[in-house]
């Protein structure tokens, strides 16, 4: 069960970065990389 949480955090960032790119930070919500957002 713990593994799922870790994968979700990493997958959310990787998957969103591939689809949205800079919106990945905002889409995930609490991702440790709000720099690519450009805000």
From Swiss-Prot:
Residue ranges the record assigns to the propeptide: 1-8
Record GO biological process: regulation of blood pressure; vasodilation
Keyword Transferase attached: no
UniProt keywords, alphabetically: Disulfide bond, Hypotensive agent, Secreted, Toxin, Vasoactive, Vasodilator
Tissue expression remark: Expressed by the venom gland.
A Pfam family annotated for this UniProt entry: ANP
Superkingdom of origin: Eukaryota
Protein name (Swiss-Prot/TrEMBL): Natriuretic peptide AsNP-a
Annotated organism of origin: Austrelaps superbus (Lowland copperhead snake)
């Amino acid at each position: 069960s713990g593994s799922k949480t870790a994968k979700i955090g990493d997958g959310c960032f990787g998957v969103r970065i591939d689809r949205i790119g800079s919106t990945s930070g905002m889409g995930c919500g609490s991702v440790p990389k709000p720099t690519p957002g450009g805000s």
